[in-house]
Structures are given as C-alpha cells and as structure tokens.
A protein has these predicted regions:
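Jelly-roll (double-stranded beta-helix
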Residues: 2-243
C-alpha cells in the first residue's frame, strides 16, 4: 500500500448479515433467499449496499425456471453452484451454464431473457446478483466465464469496470472476486481507502477478520486496510470491492 496510508487512522467497521435472517420465499418450484429487499420482501435496513442491489440465493426445481421477462439498466450476474441453467435472450444467445460458470448480462437499453433448469432430475442452485450501472442506456451485452478449473486458495477477479486482467467488463466501479477454499486456506485482500467490501459466503465456513461466517452469511466491511479470510471448511466466497 502507499506509504501515506500509514498515517491514516481507521476505525474498522463490520456489519454482519446472517443467512437465516434474509428474506425467504418458497414457491415450490423456487426456493429463494434474498440478501436485500426484493419482490414481496421489503426491509428498509437492507435495500442494497453501495452499487450492489440484489443477491438472491436460488434453488430451482427440475424443468422449472424464469420465463422470458424484461430488464433494463441493470448489471446482472449469475453464478451456478450446483446443477445447470439454460439461458436464452432477445440478443440471440442460447447457452447452458453449469456449476462453476459465471454469466453476465448488461440489460442496458432493454433485454428479454429466460433462465430455466434443463435437468429432469436435479435442482439447480445459483446466485443471482444485480449491480446498478454507473450510467443508463448502454448497449445490452452477454458474456460468460468458466471458473470450474480455478485454482483453490486464491481470489480470482471475475468482473470489473473495464475488464481488468481478463475479467468480465461491467459498467460500474465494482470488482467481483471469487475464491474457492479448502479448510485451512488463508487469503488476504487489501481494501483501498474510501472503498467498501461486501463478502458473501456461498458455501462452507470461514472466518473474516475474526468473525465466523457460514453459507448464506455476509458482511459489509469498511475502514480496514486488509480483509483476512481463513476457511474452517471447504468454502466458496464472493468478495465485492465497491466504490
């Protein structure tokens, strides 16, 4: 970090969002937990965090899914944890993404899409993420990235403004990092001054700067120089570094 940083006095702040306290909707074919207010779940304390607006932890039954529907002016990312998801959109894309795959769609001026579980037997477990773009009216775009072979014990930059280091390019000053950890793995992530982090545990268990978190838990962190993560069981974590 820059030498001048050492002269700044930081008052660390961490706000924990426990998984069991999230909004919950069980529609039979869809079992969904909402980190932030979404659809019929509304909590004024949890309307989003910085540009991060939605993290939905969804399980979709075999053969079921979200039919063709519209979006505009939103950055939409989907990460598949188990199973598979079939994507179709009005841009002409038709893909099946599987466990370990990330999908990005810039809704921009407007796009229609559907997301369906193509399996006749297996539920699909996924995270759907919405980030508010820094400008409206961009051209719709689709991209995907496979992380199935990603090295464990490392944070991988998977999305960023401008698409740094081969990551998917999004329309916001937000970096999304993905980590796959084995028990005992330790990771550190420097957090620049005036930036804040949202850490979401997708699977497993870990300790973040002294706080124990398990699957579905999350934490908002600011005013720290370094985020320290230690896996206490095999885990997957998403780290959002936000302006």
């Amino acid at each position: 970090m820059p030498a001048a940083r050492s002269s700044v006095i930081l008052a660390p702040m961490m706000l924990i969002r426990r998984g069991h306290e999230r909004g919950h909707a069980d529609h039979g074919w869809l079992d969904s937990f909402h980190t932030f207010s979404f659809a019929d779940y509304h909590d004024p304390r949890w309307m989003g965090f910085r540009s991060l607006r939605v993290i939905n932890d969804d399980r979709v039954a075999p053969g079921m899914g979200f039919g063709m529907h519209p979006h505009r002016d939103m950055e939409i990312l989907t990460y598949v944890l188990t199973g598979a998801l079939e994507h179709r959109d009005s841009m002409g894309n038709g893909r099946v993404i599987r466990a370990g795959d990330l999908q990005y769609m810039a809704a921009g001026t407007g796009v229609h899409h559907s997301e369906v579980n193509p399996s006749g037997e297996e539920w699909v477990h996924l995270l759907q993420i919405w980030i508010v773009p820094e400008r409206r009216g961009v051209a719709p775009r689709y991209e995907e990235k496979s992380m199935t072979g990603a090295t464990s014990g490392v944070l991988h930059l998977v999305a960023s403004r401008g698409g740094r280091h081969g990551s998917m390019a999004i329309h916001q000053d937000a970096d999304l990092w993905l980590g796959k950890l084995q028990a005992g793995d330790r990771l550190q992530h420097p957090l620049a001054i005036h930036r804040q982090a949202w850490v979401h545990v997708a699977e497993g268990e870990l300790v973040l700067n002294g706080e124990a978190l398990s699957a579905g838990d999350a934490a908002a962190v600011s005013e720290v120089e370094v985020l320290s993560l230690t896996a206490t069981a095999p885990a997957q974590v998403l780290l959002f570094d936000l302006a």
